[in-house]
């Protein structure tokens, strides 16, 4: 209902309108010197996103038989070769002392802190970061003036230094594409805690 379980980062949810509606809105905002920000969720996706569905299918499949450094024999539907498995956090055993892991298939678990429908993305993976740079490029080209980044402090919960490093890379990319791009991050912490995030180069942050 809240649309933070993203199924497609390159589409407008039909409840909000069409891509044409977005483009027209962006054009009208530009005429009025209003920045139109995209609410961008990098912490997690929907479990119905193609990345997660592809990884899930591979984890339920048998290995194709080829070595990891050789081409897959099953069109990358394979627990050895599927790159999307590393887009998320999967494990063979449920970690003890946490309720944020959910079963997939008979012997695998995935992490989803906010809900079972929103698996955590692995922002340690450079390929995942590159995906979001491409997503940013797409929306900036469509006329967005920047981004509101959701749940920034949860990228690596309890590790603000790593969160800041992710933000810094994202900011450098966005400012290279559009120096006037404006980015604000949701950091749900006290003022004294979230001010450290300005060291990432982000334009603004907000919290409680």
Predicted regions and their residues:
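Acidic/aromatic-lined carbohydrate-recognition and catalytic surfaces
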Residues: 1-130, 141, 148, 152-203
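Pore-domain-biased detector for 6-TM cation channels and related repeats
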Residues: 135-136, 142
């Amino acid at each position: 209902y809240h649309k933070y379980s993203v199924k497609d980062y390159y589409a407008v949810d039909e409840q909000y309108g069409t891509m044409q509606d977005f483009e027209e809105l962006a054009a009208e905002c530009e005429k009025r010197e209003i920045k139109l920000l995209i609410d961008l969720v990098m912490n997690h996706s929907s479990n119905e996103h193609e990345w997660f569905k592809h990884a899930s299918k591979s984890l339920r499949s048998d290995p194709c038989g080829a070595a990891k450094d050789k081409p897959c024999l099953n069109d990358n539907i394979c627990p050895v070769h599927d790159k999307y498995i590393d887009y998320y956090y999967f494990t063979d055993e449920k970690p003890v002392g946490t309720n944020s892991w959910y079963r997939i298939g008979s012997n695998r678990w995935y992490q989803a802190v906010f809900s079972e429908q929103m698996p955590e993305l692995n922002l340690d993976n450079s390929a995942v970061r590159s995906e979001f740079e491409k997503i940013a490029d797409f929306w900036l080209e469509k006329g967005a003036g920047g981004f509101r980044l959701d749940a920034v402090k949860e990228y690596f919960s309890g590790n603000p230094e790593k969160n800041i490093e992710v933000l810094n890379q994202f900011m450098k990319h966005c400012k290279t594409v559009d120096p006037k791009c404006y980015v604000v991050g949701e950091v749900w912490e006290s003022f004294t805690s979230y001010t450290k995030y300005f060291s990432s180069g982000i334009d603004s942050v907000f919290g409680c």
